[in-house]
Amino acid sequence: MRIALGIQYDGAAFCGWQAQPHGKTVQDRLEHALAEFARVPLHTTVAGRTDTGVHGLGQVVHFDTDLDREVFSWVRGTNAFLPSTVAVQWAKPMPETFHARFSAFERTYYYALYVHPVRSPMLAGRAGWIHTPLDDDAMRAAAAHLIGEHDFSSFRSSECQSKTPVKHLYQIDVRRVGHFVHFRFRANAFLHHMVRNLMGCLVAVGRGRYPADWLADVLAGRDRNLAAPTFMADGLYLAHVGYPAEFAVPPAQLGSVPWSSVWADLDPQS
């Protein structure tokens, strides 16, 4: 039997998703909890590996098992062995044709950026921060140059293992609410560090360091050295993974973050 799980986690507490020898990753903690509950080792396959400090609101995994358990028991039983910084949100039996990574046709990330002269300790690890004003319209104009199917080599890390740098970026939204600027990135898939590298460039434009059309030149150059430095991970959230309707994957629970009303208005499935 194939089981899919919806996972939420506080990325600030972990060294990324992928299992490591030191055991301080989300995958390590999840698989340990599953093994404790099931009394047998279970290997998970994830929709998308997140970096150190990146949060998960709508992460999806699957695993195969011969155990006959009530579906919701996978939620309650696994959570009983997880730290407070990780929680299974739902469980669902899936056909063998479902694959957490390869069945997904899109991913959505949100970035919450606190714009204020003084940093807030209450937002540490939860939102990015910049102390200088930003020009929202300039960032929107710059983002428009990135929409579509392109070679995003200028925005991939040197450690990226993707077979191709060509991705289709469907949408970038920029919305200001009070002292926050909220960004939404939706694409068929993302390269390693791609969203954080895009954020670094958008913020550089917003600060007036470059004109909006500079980003078109960076994209065309296909050279990581042309882009701005990688932006901090603190405010980045994997919000949604899109799957074909036939799998009826439950939606992510966005209400678990303070600015959920802003994000809920930006329907990740639109």
Swiss-Prot record:
It catalyses: uridine(38/39/40) in tRNA = pseudouridine(38/39/40) in tRNA. InterPro entries: PsdUridine_synth_cat_dom_sf, PsdUridine_synth_TruA, PsdUridine_synth_TruA_a/b_dom, PsdUridine_synth_TruA_C, TruA/RsuA/RluB/E/F_N. It comes from the Bacteria. It is an enzyme of class 5 (isomerase). Substrate binds at Y109. One of its GO terms (molecular function) is tRNA pseudouridine(38-40) synthase activity. Keywords: Isomerase, tRNA processing. GO terms for biological process: tRNA pseudouridine synthesis. The active site is at D51. Its EC number is 5.4.99.12. Belongs to the tRNA pseudouridine synthase TruA family. Homodimer. Formation of pseudouridine at positions 38, 39 and 40 in the anticodon stem and loop of transfer RNAs. This is tRNA pseudouridine synthase A. It comes from Burkholderia lata (strain ATCC 17760 / DSM 23089 / LMG 22485 / NCIMB 9086 / R18194 / 383).
